[in-house]
């Protein structure tokens, strides 16, 4: 049996829950999925509750919980550090939605939140797509002097049926805002060209 803990079941957390359930079914694996939630009274997205074994708001009874094979941290970015601290040592592997912490938390020492040897994956998949891998393989030996990346996105379209003004993506203090929430572009730029020496924000 595969055991998984979900911290945060908004749109992306629910998608990961449904995907994991489907993958386990395809592979003939039994799945126990639990959810650590901030508010049990808040309704889940359609179909999510049926896929969960248990829901709770605290880990105080963690002795009664299984040691999880996998934990998904998919709550608002500003709460990731707190979640990592709460579940420290409770899961063999971690799936952390990007980015790990918000812009206001860049002084967080991740070594205090992740035990030595902890397996963790941050969801920044664009660097692994075929086009990016081909470009990265083509770059060695070249001396690029300029790169232009354009990213167009319309926040009201991100979560159909949800008022975009109420979600963390619309609030910098919660880890939202274009500079940090659209981190995929920054991630693959750094992967391709290295860490920038200077960053300018032109408004």
Positions of predicted regions on the chain:
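N-terminal Rossmann-like dinucleotide-binding module
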Residues: 1-51, 66
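Rossmann-like dinucleotide-binding domain that binds NAD(P)(H)
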Residues: 161-203
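Residues at the starts of beta-strands that form the adenosine-phosphate
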Residues: 3, 30-34, 93, 119, ...
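Short hydrophobic segments within beta-strands
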Residues: 6-7, 36, 74, 123, ...
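Short beta->alpha connector loops
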Residues: 10-12, 76-79, 100-101, 126-129
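Short, well-ordered alpha-helices that flank and scaffold nucleotide-derived cofactor binding pockets
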Residues: 14, 18-26, 85, 89, ...
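A contiguous active-site-proximal alpha/beta segment in oxidoreductase catalytic domains
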Residues: 101-158
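Beta-loop-alpha module in the N-terminal Rossmann-like domain of NAD(P)-dependent dehydrogenases
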Residues: 49-112
């Amino acid at each position: 049996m595969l055991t998984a803990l979900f911290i945060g079941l908004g749109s992306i957390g629910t998608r990961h829950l449904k995907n994991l359930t489907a993958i386990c079914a395809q592979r003939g694996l039994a799945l126990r999925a639990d959810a650590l939630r901030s508010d049990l009274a808040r309704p889940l997205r359609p179909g999510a509750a049926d896929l969960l074994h248990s829901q709770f708001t605290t880990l105080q009874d963690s002795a009664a919980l299984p040691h999880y094979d996998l934990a998904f941290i998919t709550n608002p970015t500003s709460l990731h550090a707190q979640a990592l601290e709460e579940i420290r040592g409770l899961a063999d592997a971690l799936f952390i939605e990007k980015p790990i912490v918000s812009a206001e938390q860049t002084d967080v020492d991740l070594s205090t939140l992740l035990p030595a040897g902890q397996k963790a994956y941050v969801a920044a998949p664009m660097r692994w797509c075929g086009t990016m891998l081909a470009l990265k393989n083509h770059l060695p030996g070249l001396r690029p002097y300029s790169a232009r990346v354009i990213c167009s996105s319309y926040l009201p379209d991100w979560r159909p049926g949800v008022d975009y003004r109420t979600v963390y993506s619309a609030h910098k203090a919660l880890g939202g805002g274009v500079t940090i929430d659209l981190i995929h572009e920054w991630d693959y730029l750094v992967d391709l060209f290295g860490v920038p020496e200077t960053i300018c924000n032109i408004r």
